[in-house]
């Protein structure tokens, strides 16, 4: 099993507008200790929106 101090944990990206969790990705905790925010396509909204790391 993965430990809680894993360097590359799986994270879920949720749309800022509709709050749907659309993407699952990995991030490097050493390079990005803060919450990740990326502009990606939201299929629910039908356009590109900011997606933020959700817990």
UniProtKB/Swiss-Prot annotation:
Q: Which GO terms describe its cellular component?
A: cytoplasm; ribonucleoprotein complex; ribosome
Is the keyword Ubl conjugation in the record? no
> Which Pfam families does this entry report, sorted A to Z?
Ribosomal_L33
Q: Which UniProt keywords apply?
A: Ribonucleoprotein, Ribosomal protein
The GO molecular function terms of this record are: structural constituent of ribosome
The GO biological-process annotations, alphabetized, read as: translation
Q: Report the family membership.
A: Belongs to the bacterial ribosomal protein bL33 family.
What is this protein called in UniProt?
Large ribosomal subunit protein bL33A
What is the species listed in this Swiss-Prot or TrEMBL entry? Mycolicibacterium vanbaalenii (strain DSM 7251 / JCM 13017 / BCRC 16820 / KCTC 9966 / NRRL B-24157 / PYR-1) (Mycobacterium vanbaalenii)
């Amino acid at each position: 099993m993965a430990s809680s101090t894993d360097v590359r944990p799986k994270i879920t990206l949720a749309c800022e507008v509709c709050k749907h969790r659309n993407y699952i990705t990995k991030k490097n905790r050493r390079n990005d200790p803060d919450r990740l925010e990326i502009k990606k396509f939201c299929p629910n909204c039908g356009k590109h929106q900011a997606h933020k790391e959700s817990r």
